[in-house]
Structures are given as C-alpha cells and as structure tokens.
C-alpha cells in the first residue's frame, strides 16, 4: 500500500549565513536540490526562495531516531512492514547573502517553523546568522531548531566549543531552550535525529479553514514555451503559500494590489479578477488547497501578467472579499537596540520624519517615506501600495545604512 497523496501541512524555513550548507541540508532530507535557477547554479548560491517537500513516516520495528524515514520502506531494519505515514512537510530555502535579505523576509512570512543552519567550521555568529535569527523572532517564527552543520570537518572539541557559543548566544532570548542538532548534510550523518527534532519541535499549527482565504504570492510565471499555438496557450500560474482559509478549483479570485495603471501622470492599482483553473503541489493536482506548502494556482489570466515573477508580493483572496489596499499606513512600532546584519553592531537611531524606510509586509517589500512620527507610532506613505488582509499584520522595518538595507525594527500595521 502506497503512502497517501496529500498536500504538505507545514512550512519549515531553512535560514542562516551564505554557504553554511542550507541547500545541501534540504537535499539530504528531501533528495531535492532547490537551486534550480541558472544564475544560482553558476554562482553556487541561492538567489530566489528554494523549495522542496517530503513525506515523513516512522518504522514501527525500529528504535527512534533510526525509525524516521522519508519513503515507504525502512533501510535500517529492512522490515517488510511499510512504515507508518505521519505527514508531508515542505522546506523554504532562504538565501543567506546579505543583499538578499528582502527575499529572506518575504519567505519568513510563510514559515511555521525554521531551521537555523550554522557551519561548525566558521566563527559563530556570522552577520547573517544573527540577522536571520533576529528576523525570525520579529516575524514570530518561534518553533526553531538550530543545526550545527559540517561537523565532519572539525574536531569534537571544536564542535563542542561552538555548541557552547550557540548556547551563550541564545541565552536569555526566546530561543534559549531550542534544540541544537549536529549533522553532516554532505554525508547525510544524523539526518534521522533532525527529522525526529522536526516531528517533536515543529508541529503542524491549527488551521481555521472558515477564515476568508488569503494567499501570499512569492512567484508567478508563464508556463508556455515559445512558439506555442494560440489555441494551446495556458493561463498564467501564481505560486505562493496560503496563510488562512481554503481555496478551491473554479472559485472566482482577485489579485491585490493588482495591475499598475498610469493615467494623466497619476499611478493607481486595479484588482485583477480571474478564476482558479487548477491547484498543484509539486507534481500532484488537487481540488482544494489549505495552508501548508507552496501551491501553484493555475488561472485564466493572460500569461504576460504573471511572467517573470510579475505578481510577487501580491495577495490572492476571493473576488468578493473586502481587503483594503493602502498607500498610507500607520504602524505601531518597536526599534531594535542595535542594527543587525552588519559586521559592526551600530546603535539604531530614532526614526525621523521624511526618511525613506523599507517595509516588508507579508511577501511584499515596498519603500515608503515617513510622514509622521509619534512616540510608538509612525505613518508612512508608500511608493507601491500593500493589501492589508487583517489588522495588526507584522511588518519588518529596514533602513539604508552604508548602502545596504538593514533591519532596525518591527511593527504592527493598524487599519
């Protein structure tokens, strides 16, 4: 009997400094190399959000952690009994390079839990290790596992010394008691212990499917090959993660903020209306989709609207749902004490009127000018509007420091 075909039910972010082995770790668990983009293969680093999913099961004849498997057979004991299916999970592989922080933040909005990857053969913490750690805390991703990777290239003493540094780093923070699991992703050593950790510490959250459905868009594309006959063209495809509610094939939907329209020098956005033609997770088609995993929604849209990630940062909801699209937003904010991500730990200066900030709201990243500053509240006029699907959505606030956008705080968007 084969395992059931189900959609993934939890999104796990894989974050950390560039070259610490995030993509190799995802491959060790799932068998999938997530860097598929030609530029990524050439440069050997993740640029877009990578993605992979896998099943998790448990062999009832084996002891844990060896009992955990990702396919319907057990290599540990060779038992004829099929391991019991537990759930399907998905991994979002975030880029670790500092210039791609906005991409990491758009991915963090989709994460139910995270794995912070630390290379055992480098000083700890590296700038983006610290930056990603702070970002997870800000966005509220509290189910964390720290993976000490590349333990095969250091001595036991060096690995233990770094383990103590990690414990010291998390002491007194929200992550004080998170598990630290040593692995070698390259040699697939201790991956079963990591899967056990995922089952224990990153549970599937409760999903209220009666809420109005909302999907955050992180990709959109044209699946037609050049030269396709007009009558064989397929509509645009939109990829992302559902954060609440349930979508079904044939539902009428809208994309917000929508299409940029310029009339007499004034820019506005108009919602894009369409219908769901198909729902896919990986290679499997489904009739409906709920939160968990990255979903590809097929539509009847002109593919020129969706090509080359054109709709990145949008949201999808039902055609008749009321969702405000705002050019001016009010944020109840908190500043960090120090700027994270830079080599030197600079003090965060107060926000000033008329300065330009970068705001990450859901999967959208937009720039805005501060129009008013009060004690714990700012008003910002945006260059590109954002769709705000509920009150108190978390936003990450970044400021340009020495030519790079750096996280300086977070806030709740009030509507």
Curated annotation (Swiss-Prot):
What this protein catalyses is: GTP + H2O = GDP + phosphate + H(+)
GO MF, one term, reads: GTP binding
Q: Where are the transmembrane segments?
A: none
Q: Which cofactor does it need?
A: Mg(2+)
Q: Where does GTP bind?
A: 19-24, 149-152, 184-186
PROSITE patterns given for it? G_TR_2
Q: Does the keyword Hydrolase apply?
A: yes
Family the entry assigns: Belongs to the TRAFAC class translation factor GTPase superfamily. Classic translation factor GTPase family. EIF2G subfamily.
What does the subunit comment say?
A: Heterotrimer composed of an alpha, a beta and a gamma chain.
Protein name as annotated: Translation initiation factor 2 subunit gamma
Q: In the record, what lineage is assigned to the organism producing the protein?
A: Archaea, Thermoproteota, Thermoprotei, Sulfolobales, Sulfolobaceae
């Amino acid at each position: 009997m084969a395992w059931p075909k189900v959609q993934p039910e939890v999104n796990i972010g894989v974050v950390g400094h560039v070259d610490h082995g995030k993509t190799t770790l995802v491959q060790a668990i799932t068998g999938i190399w997530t860097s598929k983009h030609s530029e990524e293969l050439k440069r050997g680093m993740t640029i877009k959000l990578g993605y992979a999913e896998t099943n998790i099961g448990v062999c009832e004849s084996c002891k844990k952690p060896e009992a955990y498997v990702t396919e319907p057979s057990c290599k540990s004991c060779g038992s004829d009994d099929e391991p019991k299916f537990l759930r399907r999970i998905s991994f979002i592989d975030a880029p670790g390079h500092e210039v791609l922080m906005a991409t990491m933040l758009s991915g963090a909005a989709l994460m139910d839990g995270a794995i912070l990857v630390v290379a055992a053969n480098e000083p700890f913490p590296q700038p983006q290790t610290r930056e990603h750690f702070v970002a997870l805390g800000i966005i509220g991703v509290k189910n964390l596992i720290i993976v000490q990777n590349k333990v095969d290239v250091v001595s036991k003493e060096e690995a233990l010394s770094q383990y103590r540094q990690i414990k010291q780093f998390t002491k007194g923070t929200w992550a004080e008691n998170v598990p630290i699991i040593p692995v070698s992703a390259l040699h697939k050593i201790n991956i079963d212990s990591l899967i056990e950790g995922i089952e224990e510490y990153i549970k599937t959250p409760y999903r209220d499917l009666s809420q109005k459905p909302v999907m955050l868009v992180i990709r959109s594309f044209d699946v037609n090959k050049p030269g396709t006959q007009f009558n064989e063209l397929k509509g645009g495809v939109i990829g992302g993660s559902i954060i609440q509610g349930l979508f079904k094939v044939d539902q009428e939907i809208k994309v917000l903020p929508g299409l940029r329209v310029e009339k007499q020098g004034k820019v506005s956005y108009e919602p894009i209306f369409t219908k769901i033609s198909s729902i896919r997770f990986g290679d499997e088609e489904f009739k409906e989709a709920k939160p968990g995993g990255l979903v590809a929604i097929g539509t009847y849209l002109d593919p020129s609207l969706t090509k080359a990630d054109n709709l990145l940062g949008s949201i999808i909801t039902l055609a008749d749902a009321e969702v405000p699209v705002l050019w001016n937003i009010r944020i109840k904010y908190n500043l960090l004490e120090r700027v994270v991500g830079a080599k030197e730990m600079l003090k965060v200066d107060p926000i000033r009127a008329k300065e330009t900030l970068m705001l990450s709201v859901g999967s959208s990243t937009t720039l805005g000018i501060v129009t008013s500053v009060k004690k714990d509240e700012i008003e910002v006029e945006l260059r590109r509007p954002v769709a705000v699907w509920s009150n108190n959505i978390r936003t990450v606030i970044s400021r340009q420091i020495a030519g790079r956008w750096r996280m300086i705080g977070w806030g709740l968007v009030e509507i």
